[in-house]
């Protein structure tokens, strides 16, 4: 079942022009947009049906207060990504929106950086850029979907905790990280502390300004076709 509705209202996009263009030593083209986003494009036909897009900014988990980290434990962050969707589209509606297309985008938060990873086929690159734009500017926080995910984790938690490999990893982390409070282990107490309001607070802070972000686009792309799409979607990031 597909949903025939546009992902976004393109008339609301302001866009911004390319302020500077230069060629790199590896055949890449570097565009600097007026909104401060740097775009590095490396056309390659190594995989003819693939385009990989990565938007990255400095910060990552270093920007998250220790008391907020339980909401970003790996399993909880994964359920947020899986269940909550984007804009007005839920995690179950979005795949129907994308029926017949090969495109996706997902936010990431690593230790020192955060951003959005996206990918598509060459023909669906505009959809991937739309999803990246929405993930940045119009994230979706659905308390009901989030709680469903939390209950799913609670249901399997005893099995996870009984796994010897899981216990070994906990003990190893305690020794290796000297009981650092920023290194988390999944348990009942952590699940009680995790909440969607904290995820939303931190997420909106991290993704409020794209100035200084670097976007790499690698794959089977045509620069002249790509340029107006970059200006339209990446150029509309705040």
Region locations from a protein language model:
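A common structural junction motif
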Residues: 134-141, 233-238
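Proteolytic maturation boundary segments
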Residues: 1-66, 211-238
């Amino acid at each position: 079942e597909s949903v025939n509705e546009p992902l976004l209202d393109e008339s609301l996009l302001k866009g911004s022009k390319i302020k500077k263009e230069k060629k790199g030593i590896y055949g890449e083209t570097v565009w600097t947009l007026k909104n401060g986003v740097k775009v590095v494009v490396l056309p390659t036909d190594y995989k003819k049906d693939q385009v990989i897009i990565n938007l990255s900014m400095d910060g990552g988990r270093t920007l998250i207060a220790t008391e907020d980290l339980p909401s970003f434990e790996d399993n909880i962050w994964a359920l947020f990504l899986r269940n909550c969707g984007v804009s007005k589209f839920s995690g179950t509606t979005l795949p129907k929106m994308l029926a017949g297309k090969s495109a996706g985008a997902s936010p990431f938060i690593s230790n020192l950086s955060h951003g959005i990873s996206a990918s598509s086929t060459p023909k669906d690159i505009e959809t991937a850029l739309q999803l990246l734009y929405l993930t940045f500017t119009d994230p979706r926080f659905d308390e009901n979907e989030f709680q469903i995910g939390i209950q799913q984790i609670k249901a399997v938690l005893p099995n996870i905790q009984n796994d010897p490999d899981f216990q070994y990893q906990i003990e190893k982390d305690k020794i290796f990280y000297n009981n650092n409070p920023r290194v988390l282990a999944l348990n009942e107490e952590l699940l009680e502390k995790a909440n969607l309001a904290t995820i939303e607070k931190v997420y909106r802070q991290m993704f409020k300004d794209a100035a200084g972000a670097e976007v790499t686009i690698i794959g089977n792309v045509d620069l002249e076709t790509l340029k107006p799409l970059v200006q339209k979607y990446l150029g509309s990031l705040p």
